[in-house]
């Protein structure tokens, strides 16, 4: 792979190659997968797995960050003929935090058409789904979720699938369409992010994970943030949120979007606050609306909107141990108290939905009153906001806008299930997207672990997407190594949840690795793992020679105490001494 402009490279995983599965419904839909080859003589077929890394791990692709990735969905939009190009708003100095001259990140120079829905047209995936239309995006995600499983009759509708929460043996585009029409799943993909490979978020599909990146007023740069994005998707992040709060927000986001094959989410309130020099009281609806349109035209796929934090709910937090811990929530609470009025996000929610509908932006309804400590878990403030999010969901659905619901937070294990049950009931089964939750507050530096415990549980109970937590949570801005640790930790949690849910094909990789382990196929063990580099490095710390990867033991047990080696001996002895006949009664 050729590198230009930025020193960023993600080579393919060892013994892996990028393959593409062609749709039988759409000639211009090719879905990427990763194929893991196993040792010759193992009698194991190559294993196909879900792949989020985009073109960055395709050895036949030349990456030029100054040009961005291929616009794979423009042909689909063109065929539907329900969008139009127009002149976008001009970039203003305040869009980049009033950054000028040498302090300004250079603008992304490659121009592209800015699209919006034609007047009166509903161009969201939910609108198509409700109209009974199967889109290329729906077909794409069905193929992805099947992880290479061939479907002989793609057009066969699953007429018995209704809104009953069942997981099918085989995903079809019709099943995907039905889930989106019900509001139980979303495909977050702005029409202005044609580089994005469609993916689906819903509890009847693979549990997805999100990785947060973003610069701050203190640290980080455009190159670092693109590097983090590419690194996060290499290790398995399904979406990325750009939570930048410093200068150059607009330009950094443009570079990220043009080079991202996964959906990008934002919290528009952060940029709006930068436009008023960080003074929450000076925020206005007009400034926020302008920010929404700015980001919509760039191609942001989903917005976190803290419209559920209402003025009457703020006093409910007075006796909390940690008060309001959401950045967006605290900003809006401060604004509401200063102006003694209802949140402008709540008051103008219909208009927010109109903007989202125009570009097919999904709304992630933010939990501004999530608990920031286990002492505050499941309190009145949290569930009052959750009920409001359910009311807002119906407003969005009435306009065919896709919605997911954000959730906590800090929740001890015995209170996690109630969160899922309340969300399904109050929010009408819209996808749940949770931060962890963290199950204890005593482990700064290890909160990727405290939260992964809760994440695995709530994913099992029905959460559709998990927002990763890194070791730096509560302590500082994550670096590249923290991003990798957070992503892999959450891939483990999500996969554990998929196994518990009984997701089709979820256990195939586990079984393949277990067989490799029992057969002492060390290279296959490494290559089937989530992090082959670390697995191999740990093995090689004590047994570094290539010949050591052929022996039937590791340094943990040695040759005499290896239980699996002894199991092989037992099986061999049993085969040799097996009596003739059925072994019952005497032979005549």
Curated annotation (Swiss-Prot):
Keyword set for this entry? Answer: 4Fe-4S, Iron, Iron-sulfur, Lyase, Metal-binding, S-adenosyl-L-methionine, Thiamine biosynthesis, Zinc
Q: Where does [4Fe-4S] cluster bind?
A: 554, 557, 562
Q: Does the keyword 4Fe-4S apply?
A: yes
The residues the record assigns to binding Zn(2+) are: 410, 474
What EC number(s) has UniProt assigned to this enzyme? 4.1.99.17
Q: What does this protein do?
A: Catalyzes the synthesis of the hydroxymethylpyrimidine phosphate (HMP-P) moiety of thiamine from aminoimidazole ribotide (AIR) in a radical S-adenosyl-L-methionine (SAM)-dependent reaction.
Q: What is this protein called?
A: Phosphomethylpyrimidine synthase
């Amino acid at each position: 792979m050729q590198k230009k402009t930025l020193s960023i490279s993600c080579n393919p995983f060892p013994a892996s190659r990028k393959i593409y599965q062609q749709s039988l419904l759409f000639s211009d839909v090719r879905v990427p997968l990763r194929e893991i080859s196993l040792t010759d003589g193992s009698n194991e077929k190559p294993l196909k797995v879900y792949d989020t890394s985009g073109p960055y791990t395709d050895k036949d692709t030349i990456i030029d960050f100054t040009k961005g990735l291929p616009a794979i969905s423009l042909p689909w939009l063109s065929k539907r003929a329900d969008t139009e190009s127009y002149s976008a708003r001009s970039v203003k100095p305040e869009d980049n935090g009033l950054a000028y001259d040498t302090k300004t990140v250079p603008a992304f120079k490659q121009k592209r058409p800015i699209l919006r829905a034609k007047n009166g047209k509903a161009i969201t995936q939910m609108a198509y789904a409700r109209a009974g239309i199967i889109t290329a995006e729906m077909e794409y995600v069905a193929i992805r979720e099947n992880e290479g499983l061939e479907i002989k009759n793609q057009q066969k509708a699953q007429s018995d699938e209704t809104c009953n929460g069942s997981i099918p043996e085989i995903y079809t585009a019709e099943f995907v369409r039905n889930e989106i029409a019900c509001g139980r799943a979303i495909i977050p993909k702005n029409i202005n992010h044609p580089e994005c490979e469609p993916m689906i978020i819903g509890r009847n599909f693979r549990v997805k994970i999100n990785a947060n990146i973003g610069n701050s007023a203190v640290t980080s740069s455009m190159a670092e943030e693109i590097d983090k994005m590419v690194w996060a998707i290499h290790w398995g992040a399904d979406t990325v949120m750009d939570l930048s709060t410093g200068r150059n927000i607009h330009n950094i986001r443009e570079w990220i979007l043009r080079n991202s094959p996964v959906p990008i989410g934002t919290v528009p309130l952060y940029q709006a606050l930068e436009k008023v020099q960080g003074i929450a009281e000076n925020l206005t609806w007009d400034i926020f609306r302008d920010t929404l349109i700015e980001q919509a035209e760039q191609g942001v796929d989903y917005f976190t909107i803290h419209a559920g934090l209402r003025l009457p709910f703020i006093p409910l937090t007075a006796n909390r141990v940690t008060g309001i811990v959401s950045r967006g929530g605290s900003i809006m609470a401060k604004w509401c108290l200063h102006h003694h009025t209802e949140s402008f996000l709540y008051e103008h929610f219909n208009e927010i939905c109109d903007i989202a509908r125009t570009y097919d932006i999904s709304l992630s309804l933010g939990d501004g009153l999530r608990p920031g400590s286990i002492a505050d878990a499941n309190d009145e403030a949290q569930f009052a906001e959750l009920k409001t999010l359910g009311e807002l969901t119906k407003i969005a659905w009435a306009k065919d806008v896709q919605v997911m619901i954000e959730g906590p937070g800090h929740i001890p294990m015995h209170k996690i299930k109630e969160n899922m049950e309340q969300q399904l009931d109050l929010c009408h089964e819209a996808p749940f997207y949770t931060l962890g939750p963290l199950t204890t507050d005593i482990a700064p530096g290890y909160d990727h672990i405290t939260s992964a415990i809760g994440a695995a549980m709530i994913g099992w109970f029905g959460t559709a997407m998990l927002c990763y937590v890194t070791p730096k949570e509560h302590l500082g801005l994550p670096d590249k190594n923290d991003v990798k640790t957070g992503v892999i930790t959450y891939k483990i949690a999500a996969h554990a949840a998929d196994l518990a849910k009984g997701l089709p094909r979820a256990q195939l990789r586990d079984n393949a690795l277990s067989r490799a382990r029992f057969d002492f196929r060390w290279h296959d063990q490494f290559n089937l793992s989530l992090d082959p580099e670390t697995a191999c490095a740990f093995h090689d710390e004590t047994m570094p020679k290539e010949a050591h990867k052929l022996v039937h033991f590791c340094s943990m047990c040695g040759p005499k105490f290896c239980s699996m080696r002894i199991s092989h001996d037992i099986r061999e002895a049993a085969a040799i001494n097996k009596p003739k006949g059925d072994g019952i009664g005497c032979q005549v």
